[in-house]
Protein backbone atom coordinates (compact mmCIF):
# COMPACT_ATOMS: atom_id res chain seq x y z
CA UNK A 1 0.00 0.00 0.00
CA UNK A 2 1.32 3.44 -0.80
CA UNK A 3 2.08 5.57 2.25
CA UNK A 4 2.12 9.32 2.01
CA UNK A 5 3.84 11.87 4.23
CA UNK A 6 4.11 15.62 3.95
CA UNK A 7 7.66 16.84 4.41
CA UNK A 8 8.70 20.42 4.76
CA UNK A 9 12.33 21.42 4.24
CA UNK A 10 14.64 24.36 3.78
CA UNK A 11 13.07 26.50 6.54
CA UNK A 12 9.85 26.87 4.55
CA UNK A 13 11.78 27.71 1.40
CA UNK A 14 11.10 24.29 -0.09
CA UNK A 15 7.90 22.31 0.13
CA UNK A 16 7.99 18.56 -0.37
CA UNK A 17 5.34 15.93 -0.80
CA UNK A 18 6.82 12.46 -0.46
CA UNK A 19 5.01 9.30 -1.46
CA UNK A 20 6.61 6.11 -0.23
CA UNK A 21 5.73 2.84 -1.92
CA UNK A 22 6.13 -0.66 -0.54
CA UNK A 23 6.14 -3.37 -3.18
CA UNK A 24 3.92 -6.40 -2.95
CA UNK A 25 4.75 -10.05 -3.63
CA UNK A 26 3.06 -10.70 -6.97
CA UNK A 27 4.05 -13.19 -9.59
CA UNK A 28 7.68 -13.36 -10.70
CA UNK A 29 8.48 -11.25 -13.72
CA UNK A 30 10.83 -12.10 -16.53
CA UNK A 31 13.76 -11.31 -14.24
CA UNK A 32 12.90 -14.20 -11.92
CA UNK A 33 13.93 -14.08 -8.24
CA UNK A 34 16.57 -11.45 -8.98
CA UNK A 35 14.29 -9.33 -11.19
CA UNK A 36 14.93 -5.57 -11.13
CA UNK A 37 11.28 -5.02 -10.30
CA UNK A 38 11.88 -6.49 -6.83
CA UNK A 39 14.27 -3.66 -5.97
CA UNK A 40 13.12 -0.22 -4.91
CA UNK A 41 12.69 2.14 -7.86
CA UNK A 42 12.88 5.79 -6.80
CA UNK A 43 11.54 8.47 -9.13
CA UNK A 44 12.53 11.96 -8.03
CA UNK A 45 9.83 14.36 -9.23
CA UNK A 46 10.12 18.14 -8.99
CA UNK A 47 7.38 20.49 -10.18
CA UNK A 48 8.03 24.25 -10.11
CA UNK A 49 5.60 24.88 -7.22
CA UNK A 50 2.89 23.15 -5.18
CA UNK A 51 -0.21 24.86 -6.59
CA UNK A 52 -3.25 22.92 -7.75
CA UNK A 53 -2.01 22.11 -11.24
CA UNK A 54 1.17 20.48 -10.00
CA UNK A 55 -0.54 18.80 -7.07
CA UNK A 56 -2.80 17.16 -9.66
CA UNK A 57 0.26 15.86 -11.51
CA UNK A 58 1.80 14.61 -8.25
CA UNK A 59 -1.40 12.80 -7.32
CA UNK A 60 -1.28 10.86 -10.59
CA UNK A 61 2.41 10.04 -10.23
CA UNK A 62 1.35 8.46 -6.93
CA UNK A 63 -1.71 6.69 -8.33
CA UNK A 64 0.34 5.07 -11.07
CA UNK A 65 2.91 4.01 -8.46
CA UNK A 66 0.12 2.43 -6.42
CA UNK A 67 -0.92 0.36 -9.43
CA UNK A 68 2.68 -0.62 -10.13
CA UNK A 69 3.18 -1.72 -6.54
CA UNK A 70 -0.04 -3.72 -6.61
CA UNK A 71 1.46 -5.57 -9.59
CA UNK A 72 4.59 -6.44 -7.60
CA UNK A 73 6.87 -3.46 -8.08
CA UNK A 74 8.42 -1.40 -5.29
CA UNK A 75 8.09 2.15 -6.65
CA UNK A 76 8.65 5.26 -4.57
CA UNK A 77 7.69 8.73 -5.81
CA UNK A 78 9.78 11.35 -4.05
CA UNK A 79 8.29 14.74 -4.85
CA UNK A 80 9.77 18.08 -3.87
CA UNK A 81 9.16 21.57 -5.19
CA UNK A 82 10.27 25.14 -4.62
CA UNK A 83 7.91 27.24 -2.54
CA UNK A 84 7.27 29.59 -5.47
CA UNK A 85 7.39 29.41 -9.25
CA UNK A 86 10.13 32.04 -9.37
CA UNK A 87 12.54 30.20 -7.04
CA UNK A 88 14.67 28.91 -9.92
CA UNK A 89 17.74 28.25 -7.76
CA UNK A 90 15.72 26.10 -5.37
CA UNK A 91 14.55 23.79 -8.14
CA UNK A 92 18.14 23.50 -9.36
CA UNK A 93 19.16 22.48 -5.84
CA UNK A 94 16.37 19.89 -5.63
CA UNK A 95 17.56 18.21 -8.83
CA UNK A 96 21.16 18.27 -7.62
CA UNK A 97 20.03 16.62 -4.37
CA UNK A 98 18.27 13.89 -6.35
CA UNK A 99 21.52 13.28 -8.21
CA UNK A 100 23.43 13.07 -4.92
CA UNK A 101 20.82 10.64 -3.55
CA UNK A 102 21.27 8.51 -6.68
CA UNK A 103 17.58 8.23 -7.43
CA UNK A 104 16.80 5.94 -10.36
CA UNK A 105 14.98 8.49 -12.54
CA UNK A 106 14.40 12.24 -12.34
CA UNK A 107 11.17 13.81 -13.62
CA UNK A 108 11.02 17.59 -13.77
CA UNK A 109 8.59 20.28 -14.82
CA UNK A 110 10.97 23.22 -15.21
CA UNK A 111 10.20 26.58 -13.67
CA UNK A 112 12.63 27.89 -16.28
CA UNK A 113 14.27 25.67 -18.88
CA UNK A 114 17.65 27.42 -18.90
CA UNK A 115 17.96 27.65 -15.13
CA UNK A 116 17.84 23.89 -14.56
CA UNK A 117 20.25 22.82 -17.30
CA UNK A 118 23.35 22.63 -15.07
CA UNK A 119 21.55 20.20 -12.75
CA UNK A 120 20.26 18.12 -15.66
CA UNK A 121 23.81 17.93 -16.98
CA UNK A 122 24.91 16.54 -13.60
CA UNK A 123 22.18 13.90 -13.86
CA UNK A 124 23.40 13.06 -17.37
CA UNK A 125 26.95 12.64 -16.07
CA UNK A 126 25.68 10.38 -13.28
CA UNK A 127 23.77 8.21 -15.75
CA UNK A 128 20.36 9.06 -14.26
CA UNK A 129 17.61 9.19 -16.92
CA UNK A 130 15.67 12.46 -17.02
CA UNK A 131 12.03 12.95 -18.00
CA UNK A 132 10.86 16.50 -18.70
CA UNK A 133 7.16 17.26 -18.51
CA UNK A 134 5.20 20.35 -19.54
CA UNK A 135 6.87 20.78 -22.92
CA UNK A 136 7.77 18.91 -26.09
CA UNK A 137 10.37 21.29 -27.51
CA UNK A 138 13.80 19.56 -27.45
CA UNK A 139 16.28 21.35 -25.22
CA UNK A 140 19.88 21.94 -26.24
CA UNK A 141 22.92 20.94 -24.15
CA UNK A 142 21.14 18.26 -22.11
CA UNK A 143 20.11 14.64 -22.64
CA UNK A 144 16.44 13.91 -22.01
CA UNK A 145 15.05 10.38 -22.09
CA UNK A 146 11.48 11.52 -22.77
CA UNK A 147 9.39 14.67 -23.04
CA UNK A 148 5.82 14.37 -21.74
CA UNK A 149 3.75 17.42 -22.48
CA UNK A 150 2.58 19.70 -25.23
CA UNK A 151 3.58 22.59 -27.42
CA UNK A 152 2.94 25.67 -25.28
CA UNK A 153 2.40 27.90 -28.30
CA UNK A 154 -0.20 25.50 -29.72
CA UNK A 155 -1.98 25.34 -26.36
CA UNK A 156 -2.38 29.12 -26.32
CA UNK A 157 -3.61 29.08 -29.92
CA UNK A 158 -6.33 26.64 -28.84
CA UNK A 159 -7.39 29.16 -26.18
CA UNK A 160 -7.46 31.93 -28.77
CA UNK A 161 -9.82 29.91 -30.96
CA UNK A 162 -12.14 29.36 -28.00
CA UNK A 163 -12.33 33.14 -27.57
CA UNK A 164 -13.09 33.57 -31.28
CA UNK A 165 -15.77 30.90 -31.01
CA UNK A 166 -17.54 32.67 -28.16
CA UNK A 167 -17.55 36.02 -29.92
CA UNK A 168 -19.14 35.00 -33.20
CA UNK A 169 -16.97 32.32 -34.79
CA UNK A 170 -17.95 28.72 -35.54
CA UNK A 171 -17.64 26.10 -32.83
CA UNK A 172 -19.47 25.11 -29.65
CA UNK A 173 -19.77 28.42 -27.78
CA UNK A 174 -21.76 31.64 -28.08
CA UNK A 175 -23.99 32.58 -30.98
CA UNK A 176 -21.82 31.68 -33.98
CA UNK A 177 -22.33 28.71 -36.28
CA UNK A 178 -22.69 25.55 -34.17
CA UNK A 179 -20.49 22.59 -35.08
CA UNK A 180 -21.63 19.08 -34.19
CA UNK A 181 -18.84 17.47 -32.17
CA UNK A 182 -18.78 13.70 -31.46
CA UNK A 183 -18.06 12.89 -27.82
CA UNK A 184 -14.68 11.33 -28.63
CA UNK A 185 -13.53 14.32 -30.71
CA UNK A 186 -10.63 16.34 -29.32
CA UNK A 187 -11.11 20.09 -29.75
CA UNK A 188 -7.39 20.41 -30.39
CA UNK A 189 -5.52 22.81 -32.65
CA UNK A 190 -6.01 20.64 -35.72
CA UNK A 191 -9.79 20.63 -35.15
CA UNK A 192 -9.93 24.38 -34.59
CA UNK A 193 -7.84 25.20 -37.65
CA UNK A 194 -10.03 23.00 -39.84
CA UNK A 195 -13.18 24.55 -38.35
CA UNK A 196 -11.88 28.06 -39.13
CA UNK A 197 -10.65 27.38 -42.67
CA UNK A 198 -13.64 29.21 -44.15
CA UNK A 199 -14.71 31.30 -41.16
CA UNK A 200 -15.77 34.88 -41.84
CA UNK A 201 -13.56 37.20 -39.77
CA UNK A 202 -16.24 39.87 -40.02
CA UNK A 203 -18.52 37.78 -37.80
CA UNK A 204 -16.11 37.97 -34.86
CA UNK A 205 -15.87 41.04 -32.67
CA UNK A 206 -14.48 41.37 -29.13
CA UNK A 207 -11.94 43.16 -26.99
CA UNK A 208 -10.01 41.80 -24.06
CA UNK A 209 -6.83 41.64 -22.02
CA UNK A 210 -4.08 39.16 -21.27
CA UNK A 211 -2.55 38.03 -17.98
CA UNK A 212 0.78 36.32 -18.65
CA UNK A 213 3.10 34.23 -16.48
CA UNK A 214 6.67 35.24 -15.70
CA UNK A 215 7.54 37.88 -18.25
CA UNK A 216 10.40 36.98 -20.55
CA UNK A 217 10.60 33.29 -19.66
CA UNK A 218 10.20 30.47 -22.17
CA UNK A 219 6.74 29.28 -21.13
CA UNK A 220 5.22 32.73 -20.86
CA UNK A 221 6.60 33.90 -24.20
CA UNK A 222 5.53 30.73 -26.01
CA UNK A 223 1.96 31.14 -24.80
CA UNK A 224 1.84 34.82 -25.69
CA UNK A 225 3.16 34.02 -29.16
CA UNK A 226 0.61 31.27 -29.76
CA UNK A 227 -2.32 33.38 -28.59
CA UNK A 228 -1.28 36.43 -30.59
CA UNK A 229 -0.58 34.40 -33.73
CA UNK A 230 -4.26 33.51 -33.95
CA UNK A 231 -5.67 36.83 -32.76
CA UNK A 232 -3.57 38.81 -35.24
CA UNK A 233 -5.58 37.21 -38.07
CA UNK A 234 -8.87 38.75 -36.86
CA UNK A 235 -9.23 42.52 -37.16
CA UNK A 236 -12.43 42.47 -35.11
CA UNK A 237 -10.56 41.36 -32.00
CA UNK A 238 -8.71 44.02 -30.03
CA UNK A 239 -6.24 43.27 -27.24
CA UNK A 240 -6.30 46.23 -24.88
CA UNK A 241 -3.04 47.53 -23.45
CA UNK A 242 -0.09 45.31 -22.62
CA UNK A 243 -0.21 41.95 -20.81
CA UNK A 244 0.25 42.06 -17.05
CA UNK A 245 2.59 39.42 -15.59
CA UNK A 246 1.18 37.52 -12.60
CA UNK A 247 3.96 34.92 -12.24
CA UNK A 248 1.55 31.94 -12.60
CA UNK A 249 0.18 32.91 -9.17
CA UNK A 250 -3.48 33.12 -8.12
CA UNK A 251 -3.17 36.12 -5.81
CA UNK A 252 -1.22 38.03 -8.43
CA UNK A 253 -3.85 36.97 -10.96
CA UNK A 254 -6.46 38.64 -8.76
CA UNK A 255 -4.36 41.80 -8.63
CA UNK A 256 -3.79 41.83 -12.40
CA UNK A 257 -7.50 41.36 -13.09
CA UNK A 258 -8.41 44.11 -10.63
CA UNK A 259 -5.99 46.43 -12.40
CA UNK A 260 -7.61 45.69 -15.75
CA UNK A 261 -11.12 46.01 -14.30
CA UNK A 262 -10.27 49.44 -12.91
CA UNK A 263 -8.69 50.49 -16.20
CA UNK A 264 -11.47 49.33 -18.55
CA UNK A 265 -15.20 49.07 -17.99
CA UNK A 266 -16.93 45.75 -18.83
CA UNK A 267 -18.57 47.23 -21.92
CA UNK A 268 -15.16 47.76 -23.52
CA UNK A 269 -13.34 44.75 -22.01
CA UNK A 270 -15.27 41.61 -22.91
CA UNK A 271 -12.80 38.93 -21.86
CA UNK A 272 -9.70 38.11 -19.86
CA UNK A 273 -7.36 35.40 -21.08
CA UNK A 274 -5.07 34.22 -18.29
CA UNK A 275 -2.24 32.01 -19.51
CA UNK A 276 -2.53 29.59 -16.59
CA UNK A 277 -5.13 28.06 -14.33
CA UNK A 278 -4.04 29.71 -11.09
CA UNK A 279 -4.08 33.15 -12.68
CA UNK A 280 -7.39 32.35 -14.38
CA UNK A 281 -9.02 31.36 -11.09
CA UNK A 282 -7.72 34.61 -9.63
CA UNK A 283 -9.18 36.61 -12.51
CA UNK A 284 -12.49 34.78 -12.11
CA UNK A 285 -12.60 35.67 -8.41
CA UNK A 286 -11.85 39.33 -9.13
CA UNK A 287 -14.57 39.62 -11.77
CA UNK A 288 -17.05 37.81 -9.55
CA UNK A 289 -16.38 40.14 -6.62
CA UNK A 290 -16.93 43.14 -8.88
CA UNK A 291 -20.22 41.65 -10.09
CA UNK A 292 -19.22 41.50 -13.74
CA UNK A 293 -18.34 37.81 -14.19
CA UNK A 294 -19.87 36.06 -17.20
CA UNK A 295 -21.19 32.83 -15.67
CA UNK A 296 -23.19 31.65 -18.68
CA UNK A 297 -20.92 28.71 -19.47
CA UNK A 298 -20.74 29.96 -23.03
CA UNK A 299 -24.06 28.38 -23.98
CA UNK A 300 -25.71 31.73 -24.74
CA UNK A 301 -24.48 34.83 -26.58
CA UNK A 302 -22.11 37.00 -24.52
CA UNK A 303 -23.99 39.38 -22.24
CA UNK A 304 -23.14 43.06 -22.45
CA UNK A 305 -21.42 44.35 -19.33
CA UNK A 306 -20.00 40.96 -18.38
CA UNK A 307 -16.39 39.76 -18.53
CA UNK A 308 -15.68 36.21 -19.71
CA UNK A 309 -12.72 34.23 -18.38
CA UNK A 310 -10.61 31.96 -20.59
CA UNK A 311 -7.54 30.17 -19.32
CA UNK A 312 -5.14 27.23 -19.67
CA UNK A 313 -4.28 24.08 -17.66
CA UNK A 314 -7.45 22.30 -16.38
CA UNK A 315 -7.55 20.86 -12.86
CA UNK A 316 -10.37 19.32 -10.81
CA UNK A 317 -10.99 22.76 -9.26
CA UNK A 318 -11.22 24.65 -12.53
CA UNK A 319 -13.29 21.90 -14.14
CA UNK A 320 -15.87 22.44 -11.39
CA UNK A 321 -15.91 26.16 -12.24
CA UNK A 322 -16.37 25.33 -15.93
CA UNK A 323 -19.36 23.15 -15.01
CA UNK A 324 -20.77 26.08 -13.03
CA UNK A 325 -20.30 28.36 -16.05
CA UNK A 326 -17.79 30.69 -14.37
CA UNK A 327 -14.94 29.84 -16.72
CA UNK A 328 -16.11 29.84 -20.34
CA UNK A 329 -13.34 27.61 -21.70
CA UNK A 330 -9.96 26.28 -20.64
CA UNK A 331 -7.26 24.46 -22.58
CA UNK A 332 -6.35 21.05 -21.19
CA UNK A 333 -2.63 20.52 -20.53
CA UNK A 334 -2.85 16.96 -19.23
CA UNK A 335 -1.62 17.11 -15.64
CA UNK A 336 -3.09 13.72 -14.86
CA UNK A 337 -1.29 12.30 -17.90
CA UNK A 338 2.00 13.85 -16.76
CA UNK A 339 1.94 11.80 -13.58
CA UNK A 340 0.34 8.69 -14.99
CA UNK A 341 2.67 8.39 -17.98
CA UNK A 342 5.59 9.85 -16.03
CA UNK A 343 5.55 6.97 -13.56
CA UNK A 344 5.14 4.44 -16.37
CA UNK A 345 8.11 5.79 -18.32
CA UNK A 346 10.14 6.19 -15.13
CA UNK A 347 9.69 2.55 -14.19
CA UNK A 348 10.45 1.43 -17.74
CA UNK A 349 13.66 3.49 -17.76
CA UNK A 350 14.70 2.02 -14.41
CA UNK A 351 14.11 -1.42 -15.94
CA UNK A 352 16.30 -0.56 -18.92
CA UNK A 353 13.37 -0.50 -21.32
CA UNK A 354 12.87 1.89 -24.23
CA UNK A 355 10.35 4.72 -23.92
CA UNK A 356 9.06 7.16 -26.56
CA UNK A 357 11.12 10.30 -27.02
CA UNK A 358 7.91 12.35 -26.82
CA UNK A 359 4.38 11.85 -25.50
CA UNK A 360 2.08 14.57 -26.83
CA UNK A 361 -0.82 15.51 -24.57
CA UNK A 362 -2.56 17.30 -27.48
CA UNK A 363 -3.94 20.45 -25.80
CA UNK A 364 -7.69 20.74 -26.27
CA UNK A 365 -10.64 22.85 -25.25
CA UNK A 366 -12.67 22.03 -22.16
CA UNK A 367 -16.05 23.71 -21.82
CA UNK A 368 -19.32 23.09 -20.04
CA UNK A 369 -20.45 20.59 -22.66
CA UNK A 370 -17.49 18.19 -22.30
CA UNK A 371 -16.15 18.88 -18.78
CA UNK A 372 -17.21 15.45 -17.50
CA UNK A 373 -14.65 13.82 -19.79
CA UNK A 374 -11.81 15.35 -17.76
CA UNK A 375 -12.38 15.44 -13.99
CA UNK A 376 -13.04 13.99 -11.50
CA UNK A 377 -12.32 10.83 -13.52
CA UNK A 378 -9.94 11.60 -16.40
CA UNK A 379 -9.79 9.15 -19.25
CA UNK A 380 -6.28 7.67 -18.94
CA UNK A 381 -4.67 4.87 -20.95
CA UNK A 382 -4.36 1.53 -19.19
CA UNK A 383 -0.84 0.53 -18.17
CA UNK A 384 0.13 -3.13 -18.52
CA UNK A 385 2.26 -3.35 -15.41
CA UNK A 386 2.49 -7.12 -15.68
CA UNK A 387 4.15 -6.88 -19.08
CA UNK A 388 6.52 -4.16 -17.87
CA UNK A 389 7.38 -6.37 -14.88
CA UNK A 390 7.94 -9.42 -17.06
CA UNK A 391 10.44 -7.45 -19.13
CA UNK A 392 12.15 -5.87 -16.13
Predicted features by range, described:
Residues 22-392:
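A residue-level marker of the well-folded mature domains of exported/periplasmic proteins
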Amino acid sequence: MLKRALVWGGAAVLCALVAVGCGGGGADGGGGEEGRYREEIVIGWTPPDITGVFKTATNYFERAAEEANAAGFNVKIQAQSPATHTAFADQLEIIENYVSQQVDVIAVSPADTEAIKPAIQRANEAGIPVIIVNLLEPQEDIEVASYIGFDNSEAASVSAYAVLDYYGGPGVLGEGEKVNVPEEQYLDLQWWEKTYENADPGEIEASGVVIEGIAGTFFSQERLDGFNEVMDQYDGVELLGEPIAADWNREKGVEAAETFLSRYNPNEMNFIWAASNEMGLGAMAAAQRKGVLDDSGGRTPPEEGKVAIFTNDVTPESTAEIRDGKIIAETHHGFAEWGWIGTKFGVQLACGQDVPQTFDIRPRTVWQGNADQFYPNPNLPEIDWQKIKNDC
